[in-house]
Amino acid sequence: MLSADFLHLEKDVEMVNGCADIFHLDIMDGVLVPNISYGFPVIEAIAKKAVKPMDAHLMIVHPEKYFERFAKTGVQMMSFHLEAADRDGNDPAEMLDMIKSYGIKAGLAINPDIAPERVFPYLDKADYILVMSVFAGFGGQKFIETTYDRIRAIKSEISRIGSSCQIEVDGGVSPSNASALAAAGAEILVAGSAVFKAADPASTVEVMRAVR
């Protein structure tokens, strides 16, 4: 929803309701990432109209302080960055358990400069791994091509240990790379600019859904 038209937010919410699978909510604090997005009033407004699950991507420091508050907004998925846990010396496994305690799917996100092997210890705990294919903080960035290898590495380990963990990809996702991302092992594709700036957003979503 970072690329939505916030002056006409309800229109874009209805568009997502009609053609997509989830609402991806990018929460930025200007500390962990160099940008500020939106907070609880916007999320609560979206929640009033959303009929599809809401996925909160927390690009913030001390995310654990806000897990309960986000849970109360009605989100069904919530991820935090491994970098945030590292920064505070927190155990990502414990943080994943905290999210799950609210009955929410728990995800662990990593930026492009974090080795994919760093998430391997948590693949039996996380419901999904969010692989950033751009550096978190801004929409409309160019897709980083090494993302495919990162996805394949994580998918291979998921298969090796028999985990049900899924892979979500966010950043520069579009119809031009959706098929290759799915082939690499991604199950959840987050597209912002490619959808909201398209002449026909619903058709764009349908093209990407067809690759699954």
Task: Name each model-derived stretch.
Residues 1-79, 83-93, 98, 106, ...:
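Conserved N-terminal beta1-alpha1 strand-loop-helix module at the mouth
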Residues 134-136:
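Short glycine-rich anion-binding loops that position phosphate/pyrophosphate groups of nucleotides
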Residues 102:
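Residue microenvironments linked to proteolytic maturation
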Residues 105-109, 113:
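Internal catalytic-core helix/loop-beta-alpha segment
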Residues 172-184:
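Acidic, divalent-metal-coordinating active-site segment for phosphoryl/phosphodiester hydrolysis
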Residues 167-173, 190-194:
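Glycine-rich beta-strand-to-loop/alpha-helix junction loops that act as flexible
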